[in-house]
């Protein structure tokens, strides 16, 4: 959780410094914005394809999964703002009317394969070819989650449409907004294999594409609330599935998702 948050801080400082130089020299960007908020997800079923260091290769078919918003953590530990499923955006306006932007878009999502569901398992398991129904029991079989983050980092193109403007000014009051983008995944995968739990390291492990749409409301001059709905596709190509005793394990899977996001943001003008 801390690494993505630290990355957000570094990127914000770097982006601000870069944009100040850009505004002085090339006038390439017409302003920038920063947003922070939280999200909620729903996932499609996914086939988990395991490749273990002992030679076993098997697939757990049509696995159900859920998220874990953990919004109560903000009340219980107010300083730990990165415990819940958070989202941040750093955007750069491309025109004076601020209707077009390029955006760095990050979602800290939590993907949890639901325990104690029965799923078909096929392939080589314990050195034998199998095709049978198994219970996803962490003590006797396995558990998988990306709860230190599925962590979707991508670049968006943003289009903004002014719906309402403040009286006697040309400042926006209410905007419609849509975004499309693609990027990469930085998961930290927590695996329990026959009762042995291990939280793997962060690493780049695949790609994602998405589309997002919603509304942005300016309740103060340069401060806004944005709510959007987002849908996309995520492919974890080589997520680590190691345990303390066994290294070199990988899991590959992909799924679709639907997400609701609420953020507060502010514009920086020059």
Give residue spans per PLM region.
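Bacterial Sec-dependent N-terminal signal peptides
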Residues: 1-28, 270
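Short glycine/proline- and aromatic-enriched beta-strand/turn motifs that initiate or cap beta-hairpins
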Residues: 20-93, 187-189, 259-269
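Outer-envelope beta-barrel architecture signal
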Residues: 26-34, 98-102, 170-178, 221-227, ...
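Residues that define the transmembrane beta-barrel architecture of outer-membrane proteins
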Residues: 28-32, 82-86, 147-153, 174, ...
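Predominantly the C-terminal beta-signal and adjacent terminal strand-loop region
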Residues: 46-52, 56-64, 214, 218-270
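Outer-membrane beta-barrel translocator domains and adjoining extracellular loop/strand segments
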Residues: 46-53, 115-121, 169, 188-197, ...
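Extracellular loop and loop/strand-boundary signature of outer-membrane beta-barrel proteins
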Residues: 73-76, 139-145, 193-202, 245-253
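Gram-negative (and chloroplast) outer-membrane scaffold detector with strong preference
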Residues: 89-192, 263-268
